[in-house]
């Protein structure tokens, strides 16, 4: 007998779908979600496209633009669903902007942003294979450190 697990839909909040497989915990961590909020986390769920995906449902959370940008850095194919009174009122794919300020930390120890209290500014040079350049020291970074 095939068993299915049913997850109760959320009433008001956000569903982050199509998160790259095994990256939902990283998304959860960078969003600094209040511990009191009800959260449903599904890892490595088969998608209709035949690839594994993760899903994160957060009751009572509205994402900021910075939150969406952080998600796009981790999982560029993610989809955001905004839920009000049990109905999807808005659905969109995350999209990396051309520039990101303040949410990434430069990995160059000699960068001015790491020596002084200066907010990082980065240009997205390539989206498909993520290539990000610090606007202060010009270093290309390949491991992203999200600022809190």
From Swiss-Prot:
Can you cite a GO biological process for this protein?
pyrimidine nucleotide biosynthetic process
Relay the cofactor remark from the entry: Binds 1 zinc ion per subunit.
Provide GO CC annotations from the record: aspartate carbamoyltransferase complex
Q: Does the keyword Metal-binding apply?
A: yes
- Give the domain of life: Archaea
The protein's required cofactor(s) are namely:
Zn(2+)
User: Mind telling me which InterPro entries this protein's record contains?
Assistant: Asp_carbamoyltransf_reg_N, Asp_carbamoylTrfase_reg, Asp_carbamoyltrfase_reg_C, Asp_carbatrfase_reg_C_sf, Asp_carbatrfase_reg_N_sf
Q: Which NCBIfam families match?
A: ATCase_reg
State the name under which the record lists this protein.
Aspartate carbamoyltransferase regulatory chain
Organism phylogeny = Archaea, Methanobacteriati, Methanobacteriota, Methanomada group, Methanococci
